Amino acid sequence: MRKGAGRGSPCCPARAQLRGKESEEMIPLERSGRPGSNETMMNMTILWHDRDTLGAERCTLSSLQSGFRLASTALCPADGVPLQVAYTVDVDADWCTRHVVVHVEMPHAVADLALSADGAGAWWSQDEALSSIAGCLDVDLGITPATNTLPIRRLRLQPGAVATIGVAWVAFPSLRIVRSEQQYECLAVGQYRFRSGTYSAHLVVDAEGLVQDYEGAWRAIAQG
C-alpha cells in the first residue's frame, strides 16, 4: 500500500468490469497451481485497523502446493466512497506475483479486476499484454498493507541493504494500474523504511513478513 501513489506516472486503464450492483453476485476466487517448490506450510490470519481512514481488513496468508496466497476482505473508504473489497493474490515459491483477483463493491456498482503474470515481468489482463507494467514482479494493492509482504519476502534484505523496484500498483476504487517505483530499506530485522516518490513510512513486520505497524496507517490488532 502507498497513499496517493501513481500521481504523475504513466498508467494503463484497468481491465475492470463495472456493473450495476443489483445484477451481479460475488465472483468466486479459484485456486490454481504454481511452478516451483513450497516452503514451510503456513496459515496465518491477521486483522488490521487503519488509523488514517478507520478502515479494517481481515487477511489470511497461506501456503499453496507450490507458492503462497493472500486472501482478504477489507472495509474502507476510498475517495469518499465506502468500499467492500475481496481479493486474492497468488505468488510462486519465490514470492513473485502470478495471479490477482479483486472484487470491489460500491454503493451502486461493483468492479472486478483479474491479472496474471509469468513471474519474470510479463503481465496480462483478459489475454491482453500490459506493457506499462512490464518488468514488475510484485503487485501492490492501494488499500492494504498485505502486498508489502510480497517484496519483503521476495527481496530477503539484510539489515543495511536497500532495493529499488518497480511494482504494479492498483488504485481504488478505479482499479487503474500504475507502474510505481518503490524503495525498501531494511533498518533491522523486522523493520523497513518504505519510500515511493516523496512518500516515506516506517514498517514493522513479523517473522512471516506481515505488517504489524505501518507508520500513520495500519496496525495489527489481532493475529492467529
Language model features by range: what are they?
Residues 78-126:
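Hydrophobic/aromatic-rich structural module bridging two neighboring secondary-structure elements via a short loop
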Residues 195-224:
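C-terminal structured interaction module
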Residues 11-12:
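Cysteine-centered motifs
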Residues 20-25, 31-41:
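Short, Lys/Arg-enriched N-terminal segments with co-localized hydrophobic residues
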Residues 44-92:
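Short N-terminal edge-element motif at the start of the domain
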Residues 41-58, 63-64, 110-189:
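Solvent-exposed helix/loop surface patches that form functional interfaces
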